[in-house]
Amino acid sequence: MMDPTTDNAGYAGDPGTARTSLESLRAEIAKAVVGQDPAVTGLVVALLCRGHVLLEGVPGVAKTLLVRALASALDLDTKRVQFTPDLMPSDVTGSLVYDARTAEFSFQPGPVFTNLLLADEINRTPPKTQSSLLEAMEERQVTVDGTPRPLPDPFLVAATQNPVEYEGTYPLPEAQLDRFLLKLTIPLPSRQDEIDVLTRHAEGFNPRDLRAAGVRPVAGPADLEAARTAVAKTAVSPEITGYVVDICRATRESPSLTLGVSPRGATALLATARAWAWLTGRDYVIPDDVKALALPTLRHRIQLRPEAEMEGVTADSVINAILAHVPVPR
């Protein structure tokens, strides 16, 4: 793995090469993870938008393996924090440590000082520790004893969580949820995918040794930077901007919701649609780009009424209904 504070000079970093490299991520990650292509795409979109990702799924669906495979294929430094009920904020961000030899305090960086932080089972720790990530995610720095310390670039938090109905979980605060650009749901595999998983393990696949599985770096920070520059130049028409606003405003008027999408959420949807448009080979955004990213970008930014939940309404069903109702620009 590379030093997270340095650029990777081994990659050309021009937009055309960057797109090809990022597209090849799927093939590399598929060497370790069967299926889950939408989640892979979501992680790449988040990197392009300098955003963070929340991965939700039952235990055992390869959430952690997916993030580790992405880090290996991108040649990024990665660290993992297992969130537990007794985890302290300083265990994540770092702390001042007294050195008896010099009689001085020195800063010991926590695992947050990396390119890709895997926050495993983030909803198994109390809100105080969950909130220790807030400044890091929003400001891309950590302040300890009044001194701000910048985090490396790129920096992405990929947090995994179990569904809230599982015992021993603490629902993420709204302020924390809003810091995630995307919420990706990891489904159980199809029958054929599950057969493929078992076959790989029977043939000796070791999820702890991705190099042996053939996962190799195919892109680096220079490619990401070139891609981000190209995404920022992706054209957005006034009609597309209006379409995004109309979708988000419709959530605020939905009778099934107590909380709709904020302007920050609308900004996030436009950003992810631009990244998706660029990834698919266009330099302009179309309505289908907005639709493609609406669910992962918005599902964690709305709140259902209790009576709607009792009737079986879900966040995804509300968003899908809104997408079907809001006029699409021509």
List each model region and its residues.
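P-loop (Walker A) phosphate-binding loop of NTP-binding proteins
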Residues: 58, 92, 160
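Pre-Walker A (pre-P-loop) alpha-helix and adjacent loop at the N terminus of AAA/AAA+ ATPase modules
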Residues: 15-61, 249
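Walker B catalytic acidic pair
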Residues: 57, 120-121, 132
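Loop/turn-to-beta-strand initiation segments
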Residues: 51-53, 77, 113-117, 131, ...
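Conserved alpha-helical scaffold flanking the Walker A/P-loop in AAA+ ATPase domains
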Residues: 42-45, 98-118, 147
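Canonical AAA+ ATPase core
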Residues: 99-104, 125, 137-234, 274-276
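C-terminal engagement/docking regions of AAA+ P-loop ATPases
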Residues: 2-12, 16, 68, 251-330
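Walker A/P-loop
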Residues: 47-84
